[in-house]
């Protein structure tokens, strides 16, 4: 406008575009005919790129011959010496170049540029519609360019050198995403087949460079530097390329049973990202739904452990063995219950999973739920348990009722007792459920156990001679102390070291705001203040040694003291 003569100013203003759409149309018209093909390709790439593309990455796209349906080939003669000039010359003012972490990144000059280029408004323009960018074909362009970059390198190129190629890093990270968009897989079929051909060096070299972690697992027994023969089928199944999987199965039918990577077989891999059509195809070609891989896991073991309900349902509906045992005897139900996957536990039980199957440690899914699980899983498995008095040999021979007494809630213990749990079973440390509930202050469980006749064994003691009353006073659980005293607990019963409950209250294990009240309560029930333990000390002496001077003072006022 600065260069306009005053007499031409009004006409110039009138000729300015009336909207952004008009502005972009004018820019598109100004693109040189010789540059239109390159400009369109670069705009397509910018519209669907997985991350902002660097100048050299976009310029490299121009160096590929992407003839429709063919295998992309890099033409070194098409590379521009001045890559920034190549990009700007092709795309005019629709794009801009910015510096980002020492890289020159190409982006649309405004977010509205992409919106316009992909809009129906441009698609229905008479003159500029050839610049309309449909999303799926644009992904196909980038997928082809990415595969072209991967096909440019073979087994002689190591990982470091590969990442020096302009488009290699982007291709490795994003080619799958572009190829899986819509029907792009069909468009790039020839390129995919060429890349995944295990008789050619390309896929094996790329897999070895970028997926060494896939080769260093107990699922793959081959030389860790060489991809297994089923690696291409495994990867195609993992990423959901159904058409490619079908062609590979026809070409190499035996590979459906082979291990291909860390997930195991192609069937294992297909289920990782819910590619059920691919999984169904693999089953139709003879894949074993109970095939094994690392840790002797079947696909159902994997899905049950990670908590993938949709996959679990698909597997059980297709005949997966719900009671199959993996390493250490773990079943799918054992894994799902220890990982707290309630819906998966329910699904497995609906299909016949056993809650009492023993694993190597002697535990069962039901016992593990009692030890660690939330109450909803415990109750679910309890409804299917055959033996509610089963013991855990590696955990003190505890029964489910021991765990309920330790953890609560009372509803857990109540359900066990209603199912016939024995109230006074001893574990290997001579603990009854009442002893444990008293130690952990589970007053609701204590009350329930007493209602179920545990009071007949209120004087039972553990391997140290401590009774339930010793446990409750030593940990400051005053409500439990009251209940035990009310039902006749021995207030002067000594343990193996001669400690009476009063000794233990005076020299408690756990500080409690109720310490003085507990001592007074024991005195009210006739505790002997003169009783001495095996060290010859009275309760007052133990309190003094423990620095509990308020208790010493309380005991000193007792008449017998």
Question: Where do the protein language model's features map onto the residues?
Answer:
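Leucine-rich solenoid repeat scaffolds
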Residues: 529-561
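Ankyrin repeat A-helix N-terminal signature
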Residues: 235-240, 269-275, 302-308, 335-341, ...
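Cross-kingdom leucine-rich repeat
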Residues: 240-257, 265, 269, 273-277, ...
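Ankyrin repeat domain, specifically the short helix-to-loop turn at the C-terminus of the second helix
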Residues: 247-255, 280-288, 313-320, 346-354, ...
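Conserved ankyrin/ankyrin-like repeat signature
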Residues: 243-244, 277-278, 310-311, 343-344, ...
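Ankyrin-repeat boundary/"N-cap" motif
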Residues: 225-233, 258-266, 292-298, 325-331, ...
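Eukaryotic tandem repeat interaction scaffolds
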Residues: 431, 439, 457, 462-466, ...
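Leucine/isoleucine-rich amphipathic helices and adjacent mixed helix/strand linkers
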Residues: 1-258, 265, 269-280, 284, ...
